[in-house]
């Protein structure tokens, strides 16, 4: 019997296949691929471009303005959808493909599914070397796209039309598997995109990818319950895996039943809203005082869906030497970290099974959880009301800029606004269900400490790769994923704005309103803090011109040129007025805030291991190195 076939080009088959991919979670099924971002060039416009023009199916097509920017929008879409829906990205060959590589790293580090479709050189090699092709004397097979191999969870090349079938099936298995979720890259030779093949019709049947919740073994659950009951001061670290598992109700139930405090990673923050009594906020290098105090007292840490990055563990100094660990994770590899007791399973499913086993158990924290939270809220209130003065101002980041330098910034930027006051003002003024997006600089620290999410899944921080430029481009993806009237706020510094804001124009083009909160302190403030804290002088991290004058940039005018509604706000009153007016707008807005350097929040009970120079002529650097060696003695080695 001859199998029924349909004759399609490789690109047409790709688009047809994408339209038939569904994901089912807890009995609910929906299309997995909602659309595709494209930036057409000679490598994809007559192949994938033609296929999308002819019959896109349900796929929504968005025109990106920069390959990395549109890819970050696609990544943010998947993140905001809790990895249950994605966008693909199609680019031309050469530099267009290369621009995706950084974004692939972002998706990889954050375990976020996205399908990358970079065009490749000719499979036939007839016109070689084609425009934008690299020529390696050692191998003709090497192309720009080999750079994706280090940053893809799945990587493949399609040089014949029939290869597409196995490549796509494998890619979707990886993207829809919670253990391996991340970027899948399929490089398609540009001549192959247009080549036809008789594809079996069965390949295009509706295909449902089932996201089954893995339940731990009875042994794992029983032993985990024993460890918890034997502890006096256990603490739960809520990681991104808990959020992607939709484990909010189960976390609250366990925490309330057993009086176990919750602390959060960036990826886990807003899984449970901050108003929950046992939620002490972010932990680690960027954590709250309350969370870091409680984690230092833990005799057992229960990590739920966390990778234990250095920012979560304070470079492995956050825990007492005797602290034990239980790691609950779908990834067996992640459960092995810190010599933990391993519980391999879905966060939600695991907590459903574990909670009944802990009935009657209570921790020994007593009123410490509420006391630490009250102390922290008092500290947050102090940070909300920091005021600059020209005589003896003590910024949060101390002993770096003297009063003369701070006055110079105040005069040059025409502001006395502190970063912490500005950020908390935004938190207090926006609608409770607003989504906040950020990624790099000092602002993630302020957000992790000071931003109190009132509604679950509204805190959107890319801190796996902490990629500058994600903030605005990612905000577009978050907006595309949000409910119709849900506002999205991009929290971005001037450094990240300069790095990339390409999809600001795309947001205006497609009527996807985002609100850009631009904090301008005229420099790379976060790294300047790190530099000076470790003994160096301020060196090429401030934005100063050839005459050593602080640069003054009108970022509002840049956004206005694109067509955004813009505001300038260097006081709390002006900021509140701008925020209220921005709510009334139907298109993208930007609020340009000049804030003083060194007025971001400082760390609490933390340490970050960075590569301080062992040898230097500067005494301050030598002291910093000696301090590092002292802290290393307190750190776990693995």
Swiss-Prot record:
> What are the UniProt keywords, alphabetically?
Hydrolase, Magnesium, Metal-binding, NAD, Thiamine pyrophosphate
Record: residues binding thiamine diphosphate: 67
Q: What is its EC number?
A: 3.7.1.22
UniProt signal peptide: none
One GO cellular component term, please give it.
acetolactate synthase complex
Q: Which cofactor does it need?
A: Mg(2+); thiamine diphosphate
According to its UniProt record, in which pathway does this protein act?
Answer: Polyol metabolism; myo-inositol degradation into acetyl-CoA; acetyl-CoA from myo-inositol: step 3/7
An example Pfam family from this entry, by short name, is TPP_enzyme_N
Q: Give the disulfide map.
A: none
Free-text cofactor note:
Binds 1 Mg(2+) ion per subunit. Binds 1 thiamine pyrophosphate per subunit.
Q: What class of enzyme is it?
A: hydrolase
GO MF annotations in UniProt = 3D-(3,5/4)-trihydroxycyclohexane-1,2-dione hydrolase activity; acetolactate synthase activity; flavin adenine dinucleotide binding; magnesium ion binding; thiamine pyrophosphate binding
Region of interest: Thiamine pyrophosphate binding: 442-523
What Gene Ontology terms for biological process does this UniProt record contain?
inositol catabolic process; isoleucine biosynthetic process; L-valine biosynthetic process
- Which reactions is this enzyme annotated as catalysing? 3D-3,5/4-trihydroxycyclohexane-1,2-dione + H2O = 5-deoxy-D-glucuronate + H(+)
Per the record's keyword annotation, is Glycoprotein included, yes or no? no
**The organism sits in which domain of life?**
Bacteria
Q: Which residues take part in binding Mg(2+)?
A: 494, 521
Function summary? Involved in the cleavage of the C1-C2 bond of 3D-(3,5/4)-trihydroxycyclohexane-1,2-dione (THcHDO) to yield 5-deoxy-glucuronate (5DG).
Regarding protein family, the annotation reads: Belongs to the TPP enzyme family.
Name of the protein in its database record: 3D-(3,5/4)-trihydroxycyclohexane-1,2-dione hydrolase
Per the record, the gene is: iolD
